UniProtKB/Swiss-Prot annotation:
Keyword vocabulary terms for this entry: Cell projection, Cytoplasm, Cytoskeleton, Phosphoprotein, Retinitis pigmentosa
Keyword Cytoplasm in annotation: yes
GO terms, molecular function: protein kinase binding
InterPro entries (UniProt xref): Centrosomal_kizuma
Basic and acidic residues bias spans: 267-293, 303-316, 331-357, 471-480
Modified residues (Phosphothreonine): 379
UniProt-recorded name of the protein: Centrosomal protein kizuna
Miscellaneous comment: Kizuna means 'bonds' in Japanese.
Comp. bias (Low complexity): 503-512, 613-625
Amino acid sequence: MSRTLASAVPLSSPDYYERLGQLQHGLRDSEKKRLDLEKKLYEYNQSDTCRVKLKYVKLKNYLKEICESEKKAHTRNQEYLKRFERVQAHVVHFTTNTEKLQKLKLEYETQIKKMLCSKDSLGLKEELTDEDREKVAVHEGINSGTAMSRGLYQPATIFMGRQMSAILSMRDFSTEHKSPQPTKNFSIPDPHSHRQTAQSSNVTDSCVVQTSNDTQCLNKSDNIDGKASLQIGEKMPVTASVLSEEEQTHCLEIGSNTRHGKSNLSEGKKSAELNSPLRERLSPENRTTDLKCDSSSGSEGEILTREHIEVEEKRASPPVSPIPVSEYCESENKWSQEKHSPWEGVSDHLAHREPKSQKPFRKMQEEEEESWSTSSDLTISISEDDLILESPEPQPNPGGKMEGEDGIEALKLIHAEQERVALSTEKNCILQTLSSPDSEKESSTNAPTREPGQTPDSDVPRAQVGQHVATLKEHDNSVKEEATALLRKALTEECGRRSAIHSSESSCSLPSILNDNSGIKEAKPAVWLNSVPTREQEVSSGCGDKSKKENVAADIPITETEAYQLLKKATLQDNTNQTENRFQKTDASVSHLSGLNIGSGAFETKTANKIASEASFSSSEGSPLSRHENKKKPVINLKSNALWDESDDSNSEIEAALRPRNHNTDDSDDFYD
């Protein structure tokens, strides 16, 4: 409004200026007052009175706070005192209780000490009683050689109204084995103790266990290792006697196991791989199966007591002169070395091949070697992976002749081999059979089988075995050196002509049977496909296979050498004439085989399927030439004949060449019937 008034008043009027001067003068006065007041305030703040007042106020406030905190602390301390008093009252109560606990502790300690003292006294008494028992047992007559520790002591038990103990049975059994001359033990109170004490005792023939069901026959040689059985034979003389028919079947396995252990001793030096399957065959499980087979095949009339057997031996069995163990071992070792020499080249060749393909061949090879060492079979193997050619137990025929010089020399060689087998059979004085259950079933048609209903008649086979040995002795001296020299010469010439065509899977030649390896290497056989049907199929289709036997050379793929062709030509002519005789003998054996157990036929069918599968496996790995010819030509079903003069591969030329010519078949039929 002043502006409006000023604007209204003209600038040149004196009132305006007067009013303006007044206002400015009042402004100056107010400013001075303000400055004075500020100076006074500053001075007051800088004075001591103000500072003292401020400190006083602060101290007063602090005093108030301290008084309040003191009050709070006093109340808190009062509470703490009350709590401590309560805790002290509890502690006093607990101290009174601990006194009672200490009293109980002392009482319990005294009781525990008393119990420990009583237990110590009882333990000393028990130890004294054990020592007294041992002293009493020693005074009662325990043998010093069979002294036992306290851990093996067993209390006496009452059995069948009599008081017995393990220690007394051990003493009785040890005294039973200390007889100065060879005896026969027919009671086994403890089989494990028998195994331990048999090494220091005399050699026994058999051990019959009298059980509640039947009288079974145990094999003597429980030792799996061949060295252990050989050491037993070196400690005591080996005796053998002419046994009766009922005893003979029980004792068939004894000599075979003894020879088998010695052959394992010689074979273990050549290859360690062959011992493990043979040990499995000699394991306790296989021996128990042997006992089951013996007990099932025997009848109630064959159950013999110990007294009956001893009386029967004294009456009708004069003892044979004992044979020194050293000579027996030397002859057996020599014969095993001569037999296993054909295997050296084949095993060396197969060692460089893959292990998968060697497994079936090694299995069949071990079965072949076991049959060589445990029976009197003449087995010739030229197989690779699965091929086994067997010619079981050929009998000698002095009147038989072959056309050609090579055939005559082969026949002489067979007679020499047969004589060695027969001599080893004569030393054992028993007809040996294969020890394993599978081998017994497989050779049931080749070995003499005694039915439960047959009467004991051992004179005829024993007499014929003697004639067999006598005829073989006549041929031994003159034939052995000549046949060895001729075969060495022929094989040396053949090795010189051998070409590079012969591969490791398809080449075929006769295996070397010489003991010396002077530059003569074994040839590698070809892969042949064999399928073995059962006996019933063989008899039904036997007459229709004559044409196949004559034309077998065109059906079997084989790489022939010159020496092999010469031997084949010399023998095929006579083989045709002998075919009809073989089928007649097969028909004659059908009636004999009809009485066999049904289980053997099932086993043969199983064996046929196994061999057929292995043959198909080996054919898949054969040479290209063999596979090509197998596609064009049908597979021949080779028959497995029943008697000893017919092997499983009767269609092969090698089997025809090595088989002796039997014109006198009546004696052989009587011998094995």
